[in-house]
UniProtKB/Swiss-Prot annotation:
Main function: Catalyzes the epimerization of trans-4-hydroxy-L-proline (t4LHyp) to cis-4-hydroxy-D-proline (c4DHyp). May be involved in a degradation pathway of t4LHyp, which would allow L.aggregata to grow on t4LHyp as a sole carbon source. Displays no proline racemase activity.
Record carries keyword Isomerase: yes
Organism this protein belongs to: Roseibium aggregatum (strain ATCC 25650 / DSM 13394 / JCM 20685 / NBRC 16684 / NCIMB 2208 / IAM 12614 / B1) (Stappia aggregata)
Class in the EC hierarchy, top level: isomerase
Pfam families given in the database record: Pro_racemase (PF05544)
Residues reported in the UniProt entry to bind substrate: 86-87, 205, 231, 236-237
EC number annotated for this UniProt entry: 5.1.1.8
Organism lineage string: Bacteria, Pseudomonadati, Pseudomonadota, Alphaproteobacteria, Hyphomicrobiales
Catalytic activity: trans-4-hydroxy-L-proline = cis-4-hydroxy-D-proline
Designated name of the protein: 4-hydroxyproline 2-epimerase
Molecular function terms, GO-annotated: 4-hydroxyproline epimerase activity
UniProt similarity note: Belongs to the proline racemase family.
Cited SUPFAM superfamilies: Diaminopimelate epimerase-like
């Protein structure tokens, strides 16, 4: 199985070029559902130890249903499929450019939640025009064990987020473990309180905000991903959810740039335009770098060929 590894603002992506499972025909959403239902061992083998680690996002290239798209892609992590992934889309654009499959300019990628457009600006810089994002609920308060009441917004940016404006813990590298523990507790509190996304969807990402360390940035964040890892990047879908909240509050004008900093200090430049459904169409600009071109080997005698799951 050939893969290309990259990182976007510190967050890793592994693009699977060949050797993936046969997902049959149908829409990309149908094929993504088939991947999650029937091929979890494949996903685990690609992103988990001993070949990977819990922060890697997999990106399986598949034929697009829409012939106008340069690629079809299904994103997955160490737990499940992802409807959309901003950092991995930037990484995919840079990977395809590295392979000579796309050139600078506008391109379309088909994802399970819709078509996204990218602008390949140079060999390492990509702007992603994401799907329409929106806020579902404002100022939702839940009682968090050992912490007390925590208030945040519920918003969609390609995945479901609970966004907390003022983190009770400083967003520093030294606090990664307590920040992870806190966000896991918040997610559990949401589940116990029955707080969900649209149609009962699981809110699988928790996003905390605080003051930026970079004087050019407006905010710093910490993002808990579904499998319990933290996002090294500012999180593209999380930025999209944040833009939806800023727009709904009248705190950011259409087309106005906003610099979002991650917990490791990397940044995305983000902005939005009004969406046709009342939400926002986010644009996320960041940089990615290819780190390896590898062949994954699966030995039938290897007891951990499908990954280590604890």
């Amino acid at each position: 199985m050939r893969v290309i590894d990259s990182h976007t603002a510190g967050e890793p992506t592994r693009v699977v070029l060949d050797g993936g499972p046969d997902l049959g025909s149908g829409t990309l959403a149908e094929r993504a559902a088939r991947l999650e239902a029937e091929h979890l061992d494949f996903c685990a083998s690609v992103v988990l130890e001993p070949r990977g680690h819990d922060a890697i996002i997999g990106a399986l290239l598949v034929p697009p249903s829409d012939p106008a798209c340069a690629a079809g892609v299904i994103y997955f992590n160490n737990l499940q499929n992802l409807g959309m992934c901003g950092h991995a889309t930037i990484g995919l654009g840079v990977t395809l450019a590295h392979l000579g499959r796309i050139r600078p300019g506008r391109h379309r990628f088909e994802t399970p939640v819709g078509v996204v457009e990218i602008d390949l600006i140079d060999a390492n810089t990509v702007s992603v025009v994401n799907i329409e994002s929106y806020r579902l609920a404002k100022d939702v308060t839940v009682e968090v064990e050992g912490v007390g009441p925590v208030t945040g917004d519920v918003a969609w940016g390609g995945n479901w987020f609970f966004l907390v404006k003022n983190s009770p813990i400083a967003l520093t590298g030294a606090n990664i473990r307590p920040l992870t523990d806190l966000t896991l507790k918040i997610r559990t509190a949401l589940e116990k309180a029955g707080v969900t996304g649209k149609d009962g969807a699981w809110i699988d990402h928790i996003e905390l905000f605080g003051p930026a360390e970079d004087p050019a940035a407006q905010s710093r964040n910490f993002v808990l991903c579904p499998g319990g890892a933290y996002d090294r990047s500012p999180c593209g879908t999380g930025c999209s959810a944040k833009l939806a909240c800023l727009a709904a509050d009248g705190a950011l004008a259409p087309g106005q740039d906003y610099l979002q900093e991650s917990v490791i200090g990397s940044t995305y430049k983000i902005s939005y335009q009004p969406g046709p459904g009342g939400g926002v169409i986010p644009t996320i600009t960041g940089q990615a770098f290819v780190t390896s071109d590898a062949t994954l080997i699966f030995n039938p005698a290897d007891p951990y060929r499908s990954g280590i799951r604890l």
